[in-house]
From Swiss-Prot:
Classification via HAMAP family: NDH1_NDH1L (MF_01355)
Recorded GO CC terms: plasma membrane-derived thylakoid membrane
Subunit note: NDH-1 can be composed of about 15 different subunits; different subcomplexes with different compositions have been identified which probably have different functions.
Species for this entry: Prochlorococcus marinus (strain MIT 9301)
Sorted UniProt keywords: Membrane, NAD, NADP, Plastoquinone, Quinone, Thylakoid, Translocase, Transmembrane, Transmembrane helix, Transport
Family: Belongs to the complex I NdhL subunit family.
Localization per Swiss-Prot or TrEMBL: Cellular thylakoid membrane
Disulfide linkage: none
Reactions the enzyme catalyzes: a plastoquinone + NADH + (n+1) H(+)(in) = a plastoquinol + NAD(+) + n H(+)(out); a plastoquinone + NADPH + (n+1) H(+)(in) = a plastoquinol + NADP(+) + n H(+)(out)
Signal peptide range: none
Protein name in UniProt: NAD(P)H-quinone oxidoreductase subunit L
Protein task: NDH-1 shuttles electrons from an unknown electron donor, via FMN and iron-sulfur (Fe-S) centers, to quinones in the respiratory and/or the photosynthetic chain. The immediate electron acceptor for the enzyme in this species is believed to be plastoquinone. Couples the redox reaction to proton translocation, and thus conserves the redox energy in a proton gradient. Cyanobacterial NDH-1 also plays a role in inorganic carbon-concentration.
Xref: InterPro entries: NADH-quinone_OxRdatse_su_L
Enzyme class at the top of the EC tree: translocase
The organism's taxonomic lineage, starting at the top: Bacteria, Bacillati, Cyanobacteriota, Cyanophyceae, Synechococcales
Length: 77
């Protein structure tokens, strides 16, 4: 049992899992959530989303060149 806790490989895997969740998974879920609910969010939901954006800002910055939250428009003009 002690060899499990002293194993540097398990520690490395744990760090990779935590960092990938923080920088990749949750920011993509936030982008998806904001893109689908931007115009129909309530004030408390928006406040919570702003808090999550503040918390996961580094991951959102990584994806910002590739994703955007622009409105689709009506197609006229």
């Amino acid at each position: 049992m002690e060899s499990i806790f002293n194993n540097s490989f398990a520690t490395l895997i744990a760090y990779i899992g935590i960092i990938s969740t923080y920088l990749l998974v949750i920011p993509l879920l936030l982008f998806y959530w904001m893109n689908n609910r931007w115009n129909i969010m309530g004030k408390f939901e928006r406040l919570g989303i702003y808090g999550l954006v503040f918390l996961f800002f580094p991951g959102l910055i990584l994806f910002s060149p590739f994703l955007n939250l622009r409105l689709k428009g009506t197609g006229k003009g």
